Amino acid sequence: MTQYSFPWNDVNGDRLYDADDFMRFFAAFLKTGVVMSYKGGLRVRSAQNGMNIQVGSGSAVIEGSSYLNDADIGIQVNVASSIQDRVDSVVLRMDKNARTTQLFYKPGDTTVARNDTTYELQLASISVKTNATQITDADITDMRSDFTVCGWSTPFDNINVDGIVDQYKEIFEQKDLEFQAWFQN
């Protein structure tokens, strides 16, 4: 596809759009990640109740696809091992085959899946100590700001302002020359 424009009204069945078209459109100006400024920003915290955590309300964008959660969601952490510590994670998973984006708890797994059909954002990692009976906020590491596994959704990403800066410098230099000529006279 060399050039593409979207959307256009249908005339005799020549314009059919699907989710991929809309995702491509939104991905052009919304970076994949959690929307920091919406509600609780999908922050993972201890539920202060045994082996339970909760994911706060919030929103995210994954490759142009939107996710919205308007209430806290509770997750029960698996029973701690009596032999060794383990690290679990909470991810937001977009599954194109299932046509869903949902929260998932991954016991003993801190990897993120990213392929043609699945894309995960790791919201938090949870340290489950040997024989633990409660998860505290100190056991939870917020991963939302780590752009290698999650990141923040923004409309801005490395904006190139070189042309504007060059233009400003040229104007400044011209005005400086005009001022110097005026000042000497």
Predicted regions and their residues:
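Beta-strand-rich solenoidal segments
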Residues: 2-12, 51-185
